[in-house]
Amino acid sequence: MHQQKRQPELVEGNLPVFVFPTELIFYADDQSTHKQVLTLYNPYEFALKFKVLCTTPNKYVVIDAAGAVKPQCCVDIVIRHRDVRSCHYGVIDKFRLQVSEQSQRKALGRKEVIATLLPSAKEQQKEEEEKRIKEHLTESVFFEQSCQPENRAVSSGPSLLTVFLGVVCIAALMLPTLGDMESLVPLYLHLSVNQKLVAAYILGLITMAILRT
């Protein structure tokens, strides 16, 4: 006798539930957002029953709060905010979707969706923009602090002008003095004693400046 193949028993509460979106945001100044849609997907090979629960049911109207989803199908659940008041701004409410097999009452899985009422979409965008600017400024400050020691290390050495003047003064001291007839250096490169004294003085100043850096 052929025995019918039985479906393995599912463990209560462990079945993944697929819902989109997972967050609902209602804007007080935009009536088009006061009614939103949750889509419940059933990727399984058996039908599912579902039920929608809410932490604050007096604030919302849920159309088709209970029903069934055929195998590998989806169903839309319409949620409407009916208590749009400033005292509810920023309050986080929760919806819970529970699913079970049609032939059983125990919940096989559940998924929570949060809902928030905000005063304005523009205000929300402004807050997000301010947050991005603060993050950018924080990153900029961090970047400057990271580079600052390196910049100080680079600027701590002698400048190119200082090095150039030092080389010129050394070269001037090595040139022959006026009246030195045995030198092979052209006469126009011969320096007077006073000129060499000036070069030596400047070289001394440069040396002191380099030692202080």
From Swiss-Prot:
Domain of life: Eukaryota
InterPro entries, per the entry: Ig-like_fold, MOSPD1/3, MSP_dom, PapD-like_sf
Keywords (A to Z) from UniProt: Endoplasmic reticulum, Golgi apparatus, Membrane, Transmembrane, Transmembrane helix
Methyltransferase among keywords: no
GO biological process: one example: positive regulation of transcription by RNA polymerase II
Start and end residues of each MSP domain: 16-143
Entry's localization field: Endoplasmic reticulum membrane; Golgi apparatus membrane
GO CC list: cytoplasm; endoplasmic reticulum membrane; Golgi membrane; nucleus; perinuclear region of cytoplasm
Motif (Nuclear export signal): 205-208
Annotated transmembrane regions: 159-179, 191-211
Entry membrane topology: Multi-pass membrane protein
Main function: Plays a role in differentiation and/or proliferation of mesenchymal stem cells. Proposed to be involved in epithelial-to-mesenchymal transition (EMT). However, another study suggests that it is not required for EMT or stem cell self-renewal and acts during later stages of differentiation.
Protein name as it appears in the record: Motile sperm domain-containing protein 1
Species of provenance: Rattus norvegicus (Rat)
Organism ancestry: Eukaryota, Metazoa, Chordata, Craniata, Vertebrata
